[in-house]
């Protein structure tokens, strides 16, 4: 019992020191805690794969509105599938894309991460809410096919806006599902991806550090948005405030750390509208930040289920 209390006290002190000195600017950098690591890496934060998938989703949404009513359906569906299933080629980023007053650093997917797709991280269970007795992934393929045949992504008969349906569905079936039902569920158990071992061979971060980071990546926040009000977060997502987005002042917005994607964008949109009585944006961001500080404070020791 004494040792357990001592360990908890040490963790609390470490969190206080980390929070006041090294991590005051937001989510990272976080130091290497993996015991036995002898390389030159100093920051353990890594979630570029999740950012790549957000970009794939945004590009897919943009493509969903490019149909001309059937004439380009086959070619458009093939292009949309390359963003859903992934491609060996370095796909151009269709969205988000630079515009006047808001310059994006990356122009192609491999500049963020290679070998990523949406389909491999998509909910695969039954989806009875959609006609046809389909799985979750089959519904996505059906939506893509219908969007490719539509005129500008709109089905006049049903009123379906395929771009919106595909985007919202993907946010739930990929980003939310992966974060909540994978990285913050099974992979937070004491035995799965333990904190006293690397996430996989050859990396410099622990199993728990990376599991937490990947969940944060699916949340879609800018790493430096700590303390931002919802309006500022919303403006970054809408590409209307480069000054707030450009943390390092290089004149560009780095999609890997300075941009705001889907789930965080919608949290900010709710917080800034209506009665303004919610604070989803900062509550969730701060929970991720505090959790990462606690994992870092464990200093590479194993964490139990209760911890």
What are these regions (language model features)?
Residues 2-23:
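Gram-negative bacterial Sec-dependent N-terminal signal peptides
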Residues 25-307:
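Mature extracytoplasmic or organellar-lumen-exposed domains after removal of signal/transit peptides
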């Amino acid at each position: 019992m004494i040792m357990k209390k001592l360990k908890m006290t040490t963790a609390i002190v470490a969190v206080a020191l980390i929070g006041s000195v090294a991590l005051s600017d937001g989510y990272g950098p976080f130091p290497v805690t993996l015991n036995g690591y002898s390389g030159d890496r100093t920051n353990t934060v890594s979630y570029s794969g999740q950012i790549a998938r957000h970009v794939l989703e945004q590009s897919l949404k943009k493509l969903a509105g490019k149909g001309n009513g059937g004439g380009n359906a086959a070619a458009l569906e093939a292009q949309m599938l390359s963003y859903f299933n992934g491609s060996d080629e370095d796909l151009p980023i269709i969205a988000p894309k630079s515009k006047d007053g808001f310059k994006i650093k990356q122009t192609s997917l491999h500049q963020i991460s290679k070998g990523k797709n949406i389909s491999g991280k998509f909910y695969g269970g039954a989806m009875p809410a959609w006609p046809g007795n389909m799985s979750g992934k089959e519904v996505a393929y059906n939506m893509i096919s219908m969007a490719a045949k539509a005129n500008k992504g709109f089905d006049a008969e049903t009123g379906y806006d395929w771009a919106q349906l595909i985007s919202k569905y993907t946010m739930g079936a990929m980003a939310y599902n992966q974060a909540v039902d994978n990285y913050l569920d099974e992979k937070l158990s004491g035995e799965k991806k333990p904190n006293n071992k690397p996430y996989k061979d050859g990396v410099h971060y622990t199993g728990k550090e990376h599991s937490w980071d990947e969940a944060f990546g699916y949340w879609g926040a800018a790493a430096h948005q700590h303390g931002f009000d919802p309006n500022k977060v919303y403006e970054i997502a809408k590409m209307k405030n480069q000054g707030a987005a450009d943390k390092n002042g290089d004149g560009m917005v780095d999609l890997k750390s300075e941009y705001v994607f889907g789930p965080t964008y919608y949290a900010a949109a709710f917080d800034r509208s209506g009665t303004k009585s919610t604070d989803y944006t900062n509550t969730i961001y701060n929970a991720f930040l505090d959790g990462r500080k606690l994992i870092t404070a464990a200093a590479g020791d194993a964490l139990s289920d209760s911890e």
